[in-house]
A protein has these predicted regions:
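Local beta-strand N-terminus motif with an aromatic residue
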Residues: 78-79, 231-233
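N-terminal, positively charged/glycine-rich alpha-helical extensions of SAM-dependent methyltransferases
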Residues: 2, 9, 14-47, 186
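Class I SAM-dependent methyltransferase Rossmann-like catalytic core
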Residues: 33-77
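Conserved class I S-adenosyl-L-methionine
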Residues: 77-88
């Protein structure tokens, strides 16, 4: 079953049990349940989702449909703000950023996204180097927070907020290869540690173990972007 958010992007529905009733289970089932609880990761029916988005031109078609909206945008000082939740693998967002650059090549961009899937975050980061070459004055933010928390970049869970992982990546160099190497290094060193998922004990839905925010921008643009770079709260 496919559902659509306000931008029309397809999302595979995430099915998970909310409650396991007390009953006799085979030893094999008990082992499986214990393994799932200990080694839970967010896949969101990932095989079907990836098969769909990689074998169709859906995201390109949606980006084309959004062009009239982009052309009507009027940014307000100090930047054009773009919010994408959830980001997915970033394919659609990158197309939108290209369109915005064509219309506003000299306006600073503050792009804020949320994505709970570590795999999608990795794929999204891999697409970023070219964006920082074409549009230098960009601040890109990724969080694993809930939808209602993602604009404030702050967890509503007081206990979890104390464990906030706030990572700032200042890209150095002047080529997409330089930026790509730095982001790949960040992926290897930090991403798997700070993007862990668990089940919400009340709803059974996937949620973050620890709130995490990644802020990315070019080091040589820090002075001009100072007013729009988010600060840890």
């Amino acid at each position: 079953m496919w559902t659509y958010d306000v931008t029309g992007r397809s999302r595979s529905s995430f099915k998970c049990f909310k409650k396991i009733y007390k009953k006799k289970l085979s030893s094999r089932k008990l082992k499986i349940l214990k393994f799932m609880k200990k080694n839970f990761r967010f896949f969101d029916n990932r095989q079907k989702y990836l098969l769909f988005v990689t074998t169709t031109n859906e995201k390109n078609m949606i980006a084309d449909a959004l062009k009239p909206i982009v052309h009507k945008l009027t940014p307000k000082f100090p930047s054009l703000k773009i919010f994408d939740a959830g980001m997915g693998d970033g394919s659609l967002l990158m197309n939108i950023m290209r369109q915005c650059h064509q219309k506003m090549p000299h306006i600073p961009f503050l792009v804020s996204t949320k994505e709970i899937s570590m795999e999608d975050v990795r794929l999204g980061l891999e697409k970023l180097p070219d964006r920082f070459i074409e549009h230098k004055n960009t601040v890109f933010v990724i969080s694993n927070l809930n939808y209602t928390e993602s604009t404030s970049l702050k967890s509503n869970n007081f206990t979890k907020q104390k464990k906030m992982n706030w990572k700032v990546v200042k890209l150095r160099g002047n080529s997409s290869l330089d930026f790509s190497n730095q982001l790949r290094k960040f992926n290897r060193k930090f991403l798997s540690k700070i993007w862990q998922i668990e089940r919400n004990p009340k709803t059974g839905n996937p949620t973050y173990k620890e709130p995490s925010v990644i802020v990315i921008y070019r080091k040589d643009q820090e002075f001009t972007l100072k007013n729009i770079i988010p600060k840890k709260k």
